[in-house]
């Protein structure tokens, strides 16, 4: 089921998101966060986390958090490798 969800998210990123414009108030974007959450936590928990994130990504949410590192921090704590994009 995770593979299907990831394919749907990728479809959204490549075909639907460009039509809507860059409206996400978070970094990483909600769709990227959903991909990371599903990969780390599995289908159900990852979808739940993505749903909670998407609810916050609208103009009426009373919050100013723009940068969210929760998923990436979890990857470091759990021992999963995190790609370092800085030159050595």
UniProtKB/Swiss-Prot annotation:
Instruction: Give the InterPro entries listed for this entry.
Output: Membr_insert_effic_factor_YidD
- Give the UniProt entry's GO cellular component terms: plasma membrane
Family matches, as Pfam families: YidD
Query: Which compartments is it annotated to reside in?
Result: Cell inner membrane
Could you tell me the membrane topology recorded for this protein? Peripheral membrane protein
Q: Which UniProt keywords apply?
A: Cell inner membrane, Cell membrane, Membrane
Family matches, as NCBIfam families? membrane protein insertion efficiency factor YidD (TIGR00278)
> Main role?
Could be involved in insertion of integral membrane proteins into the membrane.
Tell me its family.
Belongs to the UPF0161 family.
Q: What is this protein called?
A: Putative membrane protein insertion efficiency factor
Q: Which organism is it from?
A: Rickettsia canadensis (strain McKiel)
């Amino acid at each position: 089921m995770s593979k299907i969800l990831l394919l749907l998210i990728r479809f959204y990123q490549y075909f639907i998101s460009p039509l809507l414009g860059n409206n996400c108030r978070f970094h990483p974007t909600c769709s990227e966060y959903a991909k990371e959450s599903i990969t780390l936590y599995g289908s159900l928990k990852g979808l739940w986390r993505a749903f909670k994130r998407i609810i916050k990504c609208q103009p009426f949410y009373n919050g100013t958090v723009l940068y969210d590192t929760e998923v990436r921090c979890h990857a470091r704590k759990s021992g999963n490798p995190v790609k370092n994009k800085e030159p050595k």
